[in-house]
Structures are given as structure tokens and as C-alpha cells.
Amino acid sequence: MRIGIRAHDVAYAPLEELIPNIHAQGFHCMHIALSKSIKEFKPGVETMTPGLAMYIKELCTENKVDVAVLGCYLNLCNPNPEKHKEIVEKYKAHIRFASILGCGVVGTETGAVNEEYKYEPANHSEEALQCFIDNLRPIVKYAEQFGVIVAIEPVWKHIVYTVERARKVLDAIDSPNLQIIFDPVNLLCVDNLAQQDEIIEKAFELLLKDIAVVHCKDYI
């Protein structure tokens, strides 16, 4: 196991300073979402070039910091067809970018049924779950071609909000290139806090062999 840090949890700096700063804090790997860590330009399909990937890879090599996860936090169940097409292309760009970067995992969350990507009760419906499975399947298929793992992170406010639903997604898509980012705090809400131990135990029971990354944090 290697302990890393999310790049956007470190004080902002340009990449040529950010990555050395991460190493200086004692970390040897990071979870980076380009849209959260690059402010000099807008990361997108057009700017996520092989050259940029190689530049970041060289910075990482020089500073002995691996990219453990490339974050892509976009809503695969956006109901707007045009925006959904754009989102799919961005996922594909992240997968290609990760393969050049030498990053094995593209991490994501599981979306909402609205354009605003916010909680509403319909996120927890069976229809929402099926929408997510249907829209995730071609993304995972694309990742298989590049040898990249797509890791989904269950979050209570989103479509995959329990460990049981996460297991359903894994079983439905049935690919070694689909795994889990497990953040136990993100599965909690005011209504289930008293069951936190049981929820964590159930997560390891149902998901253990498919967990690629664990997020650790305190909460209030």
C-alpha cells in the first residue's frame, strides 16, 4: 500500500511547483483532477494532449511522485443529450491521457439524474441505477482497450449510494477494468451514522476484492 494525497488538497501552485511540494510533504503518489489542479488554462479534450501527459509524467518521475488516480468527476447521467455527448468524450480523453501518463486508474463518482449534479430522491431510484450502468458500460469498454481501470466512488448523495448498489454495478458490467474507490465517510448521512461500523464491514464483505483505492479522512 502507498499513501498519497489529493493534489487539490495541497496549497495551489503551478504543476512544476505542486508536484515537488507533494514530494516535500512526504507523499510518493497523488490523486489529481486536472480541472481542480490546473488554473493556467482550462483542461479539456483539446488540451489533454500526449505532450501534456508526457510533461506531467516527467515532472512526476523527477520528483518521485506517481499519479495513482486521474480524477474525472463528470455526470454520466446528465439528462441533456448534447452535454452527455461532451461528457463521454471527456471520459475517453481522460482514459487516453491516463494511459500515456502511466496512471492505471481513472476515478469518478456516480452522478445524478439532473444537470446540476445535485442530490434529489430520484438519484436513489432503480431507474437512475440502470441509467448509470448503461452509460458506464461503454466507458469501461473503452478503458479496456487502453489497459486503464475505471474506479467508481460510491457517495450517499449520488446514484450509487450504498455498497449493495456498487456491487450491482460491478456485477452488471463484469469487467476487471471496473473497480472501486472506497471512501467510507461518503457513504454516511445523518440517518445512518449509528450504523457506520456495519456499513464499513458490509463494504469489505461485498467489495473487498474490487477496491483499488481507499480515501481516508476525518469528518464532523
Question: Which functions belong to the PLM regions below?
Answer:
Residues 1-13:
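Boundary/entry segment of secreted carbohydrate-active catalytic domains
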Residues 1-3, 65-68, 88:
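Transmembrane beta-strand segments of Gram-negative outer membrane beta-barrel proteins
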Residues 2-5, 30, 36, 70, ...:
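Acidic/histidine-rich catalytic cores of soluble enzymes
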Residues 11-23, 85-95, 193-205:
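Short, acidic/polar
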Residues 16-17, 54-63, 77-182:
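Active-site acidic/histidine proton-transfer and metal-coordination neighborhood
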